[in-house]
Amino acid sequence: MARDADTLFRLTAGLIEDHLPGQSPWTTTEAIGANGFGADPLFEALIAERDGQPIGFVSFFRGYAGWRGKAMGIVHALYVLPEERRSGAARALMAGVARIAREREWIRIELFVEEGRPAISFYDRIGMRDLNHRHMRLEGEALERLALDSPGIV
């Protein structure tokens, strides 16, 4: 567990560096360990290795497709070391999530990807469809303000 949490931390740092050069990770090895390997895990992860060395990971969790009334998988992050890209590692990681989805009878896998990212063509190649949805986020002060807004009906 501790080794996997450390591996996921290092790979997450690489993912952050790809997206926001110079930015330090906002998480810690301890947080990854507690959130992924504790009594009530918030996510699962698969780690790809070559010759015993980690080269990438995918993290995912179970979600709910309300319109269909069934469970689904949500990929939170997919990352492969730059020198290992186009090696089949990303496809193997996503295939692993697909096998888990099939075993657990999840009806689909979803993920969010930033516009213009090179990964979009990879997702197209493995059969994912672009839904053209917006990804919205509420956090920080906006979350706090909304939480305090109570019309008294909930």
Where are these regions (language model features)?
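A short helix-loop-beta-strand connector motif used in the catalytic cores of GNAT acetyltransferases and
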Residues: 35-47, 74
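Conserved GNAT-fold acetyl-CoA-binding loop/helix
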Residues: 9-34
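Conserved beta-strand-loop-alpha-helix junction that forms the acyl-donor binding cleft
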Residues: 85, 109-120, 137-142
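Conserved GNAT acetyl-CoA-binding A-motif
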Residues: 94, 101-114
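A short beta-loop-alpha structural element at the N-terminal edge
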Residues: 1-10
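Conserved active-site alpha-helix within GNAT-family acetyltransferase domains
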Residues: 91, 103, 115-132, 138
